[in-house]
UniProtKB/Swiss-Prot annotation:
GO terms for molecular function: structural constituent of ribosome. InterPro entries: Ribosomal_bL33, Ribosomal_bL33_CS, Ribosomal_bL33_sf, Ribosomal_zn-bd. Belongs to the bacterial ribosomal protein bL33 family. GO terms for biological process: translation. PANTHER family: 50S RIBOSOMAL PROTEIN L33, CHLOROPLASTIC (PTHR43168), LARGE RIBOSOMAL SUBUNIT PROTEIN BL33C (PTHR43168:SF2). The keyword Ribosomal protein applies. It comes from Myxococcus xanthus (strain DK1622). It comes from the Bacteria. This is Large ribosomal subunit protein bL33A. It holds the Pfam family Ribosomal_L33.
């Protein structure tokens, strides 16, 4: 059985550059970089998090 099209990525804070979250994403369905608003424990507030390599 072949592996899926999903790859593991990490989400890093755009302000302090700390990697706080890991998730998976479908490579075929969404080819652009993922950007979400998540809570950053280092900044202690919600910040934008961009996709980075694990």
């Amino acid at each position: 059985m072949p592996k899926g099209n999903r790859s593991i990525i990490s989400l890093e804070c755009t302000v302090c550059k700390e990697r706080n979250y890991t998730t998976t994403k479908n490579k075929r369905k969404s080819q652009d970089k993922l950007e979400l608003s998540k809570f950053c424990p280092r900044c202690r507030k919600h910040q934008d998090h961009k996709e980075g390599k694990v």
